[in-house]
């Protein structure tokens, strides 16, 4: 092989030697904690913000097949660990996935722990046979307002995500009178308690839980904030545990059990993290005649989760007060599932 051909090989070999011969203080935890000043780093979509392996600073977790050290840990929420190879060389490793089932998505096989972009709009991760995706584009909602009566999303050349634009007002349209009627009036206006500082507070009902069992997500849209801007809020929800066999609790002669009693308090789990408190939560039951039972009255409370790395995160979570059993049941994998569920009333938050 010519000297020219050996050039890239020699450079790669020198780089490998440099990585392996770096001082251990940059990888192990013998050095004192020195975190960068300022706010915590902002991680790319789908990448967890975790404490480093020394418990000092918040860092963006390393992903599958990336180099890792004791100070630069792998993403624990994706089942990754740092494989250092031989115990004699515990300085630099490679992020490796724990044993888990692969995923098939779009005709491509992905290993457990592997991240990929299904399109320019979504970042996805395979975790033990299941694929989860987070949007890369904004999912905000914008209603007509006096300063922007005709908002609409448009696809701009060279950009993947659609963006909001405000068209110029047009005469003799339906939107103009609608805006006038939308503003509060002394006699026929909305509840005065919902008006503050030129802002008509609007909040939608919470959507149905994204999962019929296990931990899911429920969302709503509100402008109840300092800037009176519409924003999407989310909360965790669990209609019922997946492992519970509720049909055996149905009394003889009955076809449904609406709110089964849980024998003992439980702790919730989220991405490997566990709630710090135990909860005697209510769940919705099941029917044997084709009806489904869903939350009817709920409330929203904060729940603190503690992760294996010591990080504590606080999440809003739905707690069920009452359930209703009905025939408006969605089909399996129905993307319009929330349209079939009855609305949830009396939510306190």
From Swiss-Prot:
Residues 198-243 form the TSP type-1 domain. It comes from the Eukaryota. Pfam families: Cys_knot (PF00007), IGFBP (PF00219), TSP1_CCN (PF19035), VWC (PF00093). The keyword Plastid does not apply. Its main location: secreted. GO terms for biological process: angiogenesis; cartilage condensation; cell adhesion; cell migration; cell-matrix adhesion; chondrocyte differentiation; chondrocyte proliferation; DNA biosynthetic process. Residues 1-26 form the signal peptide. Residues 247-349 are annotated as: Heparin-binding. Keywords: Cell adhesion, Disulfide bond, DNA synthesis, Extracellular matrix, Heparin-binding, Secreted, Signal. SUPFAM superfamilies: FnI-like domain, Growth factor receptor domain, TSP-1 type 1 repeat. Disulfide bonds join 29-54, 33-56, 35-57, 43-60, 68-82, 74-95, 256-293, 273-307, 284-323, 287-325, 292-329. GO terms for molecular function: heparin binding; integrin binding. Belongs to the CCN family. PANTHER family: CCN FAMILY MEMBER 2 (PTHR11348:SF7), CONNECTIVE TISSUE GROWTH FACTOR-RELATED (PTHR11348). This is CCN family member 2.
